[in-house]
C-alpha cells in the first residue's frame, strides 16, 4: 500500500519539477483515490474470515444450521469496493441458509456497508433530489453509485426509522414508555401544522381537492414539533431554548398523528412541564387533537394566522381599493391584538348587516373568532411570557418538508414520502447519530 502512494508522489513531484506548477485540486483528488484504494485493500484483508467456522449454529426456527463452506460477497465501503468472505450455514429443518457474519456487520441482504448507507441516506434526504445526491457522493466521497441506490437506501433506512417510531408509539399507548426523569421544565410547547405534498396519481384516487376541477393533487403531511422555553430576553420576549426542538410527522390520519405527537411530547418530558402550551392555526383537527391528547394545556392560535383571517375578509369587502383594505384591517386588528374579541365579533356582525351580499362570509369569520376567543387572548399570553406565533412549525413545514418534497416536477408515493420525512425529522431532531448507534447495539 505504501509503495503505490510513494510512486504516485514521485510522479507528482516529477511533474512539478518539469512544469514549475502544481494542480493542487488534481493532486488532492489523486491522493484521496490512492489512499482509499490502499484502505480498501487493507479492509478486504480484515473482512476475510480467518478463524475456523462453527460446524453448527442455532437457527431462528429452533433447529441447527450446518456449515456448508465459505462464500465471498462484494461490498462497497466508504473506502471503495472490497470483498468479504464469511461462513455459510444451512438449516435442513426450515430449508433456509444464513450468514451470521452479515448480521453482525449489519450488511444482511445488501452489498453496501453501514457507512455507505449512512452517507446515501444523508444525501438522499438532504439534497434537492436523489440524482443530486448521487453527484454529491461522487464529488465528496469519491464513490460511484447509481441514483436508484441513493433512492432505495434512503427509503429503506427511512422505513426502518418509521418502524422504530411506531414501536415507540405502541409502547406509549400501552403505557410502557420509560419515565422521562429530570428537572422540571418551565414551559413546553407543542406545535402542529399541515402542508400538501404532490403525489403520483394512484395515491390520489377517490380524493377531492381544492382546485377548480375538484381533483386532489397533494396529500397532507401532518408535522409536529416540541420545544422548551426557560427564559425571556432583556425586552421580555420569550426565547426558545437552543437545540430543544424535535420534529415528528407523516402522511397519516389525524388520529394516527395524535398518537405520534403525544408520544413525542411524553418522550420530551411533558409530564414534567410546569406550563404546557399547544399552538396551531384554526384547523379543527388541531384543537380536537389538543383536547384529546393534551387536556388542560394552554391553547393558542397563531397570531399571524388570526390576522390573516381579517386580511382575507378585507379583500372581499374592498377588492379593488388597497388603501381601504388596509384601513379596514388596521381598525379591526386593534381589537384582536388588544384581546377584545367580543368587540371584534360585534363589529364583524354589524358589517354582515350592512353588506348583505357578503353576510355569509362575514358571519363565518365572526364565528371563527368567537369559537377561538379563549385561544386568541394575546395580551394575556404575552403577560405570561409565552410565544403567540407558531413560526417554529411553519418554518418546519417550509424547510423540513417543502425544501425536499415540494420541488418542481416531484411526485411521491406515500411510502417514499414518509420514508424521507422520517429521515429528515430524525436528522433535524439531532437523533440521526443515535439511530446509527442503535443499529450497532
Q: Language-model segments: which ranges?
A:
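Catalytic center-proximal scaffold of phosphoryl-transfer enzymes
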Residues: 1-44, 86-441
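Sterically constrained small-residue positions within well-ordered secondary structures
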Residues: 50, 66, 82, 181-183, ...
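Cys/His-rich short segments
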Residues: 55-107
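Short glycine-rich, low-complexity/disordered patches
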Residues: 22-26, 45-61
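Short, intrinsically disordered, charge-biased short linear motifs at domain edges
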Residues: 42-50, 75-82
Amino acid at each position: 500500500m505504501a509503495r503505490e502512494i510513494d510512486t504516485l508522489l514521485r510522479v507528482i513531484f516529477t511533474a512539478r519539477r518539469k512544469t514549475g506548477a502544481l494542480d493542487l485540486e488534481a493532486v488532492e483528488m489523486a491522493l484521496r483515490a490512492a489512499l482509499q484504494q490502499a484502505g480498501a485493500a487493507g479492509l478486504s484483508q480484515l473482512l476475510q474470515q480467518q478463524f475456523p467456522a462453527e460446524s453448527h449454529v442455532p437457527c431462528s426456527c429452533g433447529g441447527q444450521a450446518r456449515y456448508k463452506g465459505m462464500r465471498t460477497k462484494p461490498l462497497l465501503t466508504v473506502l471503495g469496493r472490497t470483498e468479504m468472505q464469511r461462513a455459510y450455514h444451512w438449516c435442513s429443518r426450515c430449508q433456509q441458509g444464513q450468514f451470521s457474519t452479515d448480521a453482525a456487520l449489519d450488511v444482511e441482504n445488501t452489498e453496501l456497508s453501514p457507512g455507505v448507507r449512512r452517507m446515501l441516506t444523508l444525501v438522499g434526504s438532504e439534497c434537492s433530489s436523489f440524482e443530486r445526491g448521487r453527484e454529491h457522493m461522487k464529488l465528496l466521497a469519491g464513490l460511484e453509485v447509481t441514483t436508484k441506490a441513493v433512492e432505495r437506501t434512503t427509503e429503506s433506512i427511512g422505513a426502518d426509522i418509521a418502524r422504530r417510531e411506531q414501536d415507540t408509539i405502541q409502547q406509549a399507548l400501552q403505557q410502557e414508555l420509560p419515565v422521562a426523569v429530570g428537572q422540571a421544565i418551565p414551559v413546553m410547547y407543542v406545535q402542529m401544522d399541515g402542508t400538501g405534498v404532490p403525489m403520483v396519481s394512484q395515491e390520489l384516487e377517490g380524493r377531492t381537492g381544492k382546485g377548480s376541477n375538484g381533483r386532489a393533487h397533494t396529500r397532507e403531511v401532518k408535522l409536529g414539533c416540541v420545544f422548551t422555553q426557560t427564559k425571556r430576553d432583556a425586552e421580555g420576549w420569550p426565547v426558545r431554548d437552543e437545540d430543544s426542538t424535535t420534529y415528528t410527522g407523516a402522511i397519516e390520519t389525524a388520529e394516527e398523528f395524535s398518537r405520534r405527537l403525544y408520544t413525542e411530547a411524553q418522550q420530551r418530558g411533558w409530564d414534567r412541564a410546569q406550563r404546557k402550551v399547544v399552538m396551531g392555526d384554526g384547523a379543527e383537527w388541531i384543537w380536537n387533537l389538543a383536547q384529546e391528547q393534551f387536556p388542560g394545556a394552554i391553547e393558542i392560535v397563531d397570531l399571524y394566522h388570526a390576522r390573516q383571517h381579517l386580511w382575507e375578509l378585507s379583500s372581499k369587502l374592498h377588492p379593488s381599493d388597497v388603501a381601504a383594505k388596509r384601513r379596514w384591517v388596521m381598525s379591526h386588528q386593534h381589537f384582536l391584538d388588544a384581546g377584545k374579541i367580543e368587540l371584534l365579533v360585534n363589529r364583524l356582525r354589524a358589517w354582515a348587516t350592512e353588506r348583505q351580499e357578503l353576510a355569509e362570509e362575514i358571519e363565518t369569520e365572526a364565528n371563527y373568532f368567537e369559537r377561538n376567543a379563549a385561544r386568541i387572548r394575546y395580551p394575556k399570553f404575552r403577560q405570561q411570557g409565552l410565544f403567540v406565533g407558531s413560526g417554529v412549525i411553519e418554518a418546519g413545514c417550509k424547510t423540513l418538508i417543502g425544501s425536499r418534497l415540494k420541488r418542481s416536477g416531484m411526485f411521491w408515493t406515500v411510502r417514499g414520502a414518509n420514508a424521507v420525512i422520517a429521515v429528515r425529522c430524525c436528522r433535524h431532531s439531532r437523533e440521526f447519530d443515535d439511530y446509527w448507534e442503535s443499529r450497532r447495539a
